[in-house]
Every structure is written in C-alpha cells, then in structure tokens.
C-alpha cells in the first residue's frame, strides 16, 4: 500500500496500469505541450472534449439523467392526470426502455425529460436536480452519483488541465442538468458544457427576471450533432476527444481526421463486468460500440480496456483498500 501512495505522488495517472493506453496519453500530452517540440500546440488551442455517460461515469443500469427523470415522474404522476396519460410517461414508468430509446435522437426519452422541467424557471430546475442528487444513490454501488465517477478519467481531466488544456463536456445529456453538478464533480465549469438543449423564454416577473424552460427542443447533442455542437458552442476544433460509444464516433472523426494540429482520440471500452459493466455491440440500453471500435485501428485511436488498463475504477475502491490495510 505504501508503494501505491508513493506512486501517486509522482505518477500523474496512478489509476492507469502501465501499458500502451497510458503511454499514448503521456506521449501525446508531452509532444503538444513541450516548447520547441515540432508538435507544440499553443495553450488557447488545447481543447479536449469528453463524452459524459459511459466515459466519465457509468451509464448503467440506466443513464443518470434517466434515473432522475423516472424519479420525478413517480413523484408527480399521482397528482398530475395529464402527465400520467402521456404514452411515453406510461412507457417510462413501465420500464419500456426500447420505446423511449427508439429513433435516432431518442425522441421518447427527450419528451419525458422535457416533461420534468417544462414551466420551471432555470433556478427551480437547478434546485430540483440538487435536491435529487442529495438523496439519490447508484442502485448497484450504493453511493451518491457524484462519487461513482471513473477515477482514471478524473485523473486524466486534471492531468490535461495542469498542462494547459481546456476540458469540455460534449454529451447527449441535457446541458442544464449537467451544469448543476459538473464543477463540483469534475472540476469543469458550467460554461464548458455542451449538451442537448431545450428552448427557454425570458419573463420579467414581479420578483425579477427569470428564464422559463419549455417543452420545445432546440438541439440534440449526440452522434453527428456533437461536431455541430462543438462548432456552435466552443468555436474551436478539439485536439483531443474521449468517448465510449458510436454516439461519439463523429466527434472522434472530427477531432482526428485532417486536423491541422496533432490530435488524439480515445475510446473507453467497457470490459469489466466484475467491477463495473461489460458491453459493446449489444448493450441492454445505451452505449453501442461497433463502428467506432472498428475504425479505431485505422485512425490510431487509443482503445482503453477497462479491465486491463485500470487498476482502480472508482475512487471508493481506494477507501476500501485503505481500510483493509489498517
């Protein structure tokens, strides 16, 4: 145990086992941040984009925002007959995920997500999410969701930040949902979140100005929408992108193909059903990984095997080890 502590003081990525994946990260960062290197990239251009669900924290047994939506529906349906009559709400409460996830942009899921916040001000929605996060726990690990993050990816975020990178979340999840907690959980400020967005409207009330959320969708930040969102909301092409599914395929392509700067792509492959979950081509819910995995060797993308490359997956694993060592 003492060796692990000593290593963590000198190794910027101690949760990563030595090997090809870790070496590829260290090598890329060194070459783009070392002054005088032919591959040096100025700090303003060091943009890194990260998917969230399945890349920075688990998307199983259901994505975290979906768990929030289900809990909100269960809370409201008994007193809101109109909401209870919606077929998509009924599908959600019956556990019919296939119906909700049908279509390229998960129209059913987007619809019920909108139902949980339509008519709320942005401040009210933020308070609702905060209250839920304060009591909700991951059903398998029994920990608050903010503690069930991937320790190796958290180390990577901090390593990149220390080397002048600006990290962005680029996720199919709701931007307003993620902005509530990303700074506390990942150290990423809310203005560096690109996600699916709905229409809001301005109102001047007696208490002051507010923004009110509506049922209308503006932008779905998934699949081919991710490069579009990057251009619209970031305005710079990333030099590094990190994902875990075919939903991140276009973002990886946009980052690494014909980029005038050196670039890096990484795919987190879920291969550990003991410590987390194992899935790729035939996931139960989301996270299908076929095309991006097939293209990775051609593009030089790093494929992270969670089982082989990560000696720790979650921060609380280290707490358990410390207790065993005492």
Tell me the role of every PLM-derived stretch.
Residues 2-16, 20-26, 30, 45, ...:
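C-terminal cap/substrate-recognition subdomain and adjoining C-terminal extension
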Residues 35:
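Active-site phosphate-binding and catalytic loops of NTP-dependent enzymes
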Residues 43-61, 252:
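Asp-based phosphoryl-transfer active-site loop
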Residues 61-147, 151:
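A metal-dependent, Asp-based hydrolase signature
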Residues 7-14, 55, 95-98, 109-115, ...:
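Charged, low-complexity surface segments at secondary-structure and domain boundaries
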Residues 38-42:
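Short loop/turn motifs at secondary-structure junctions and domain boundaries
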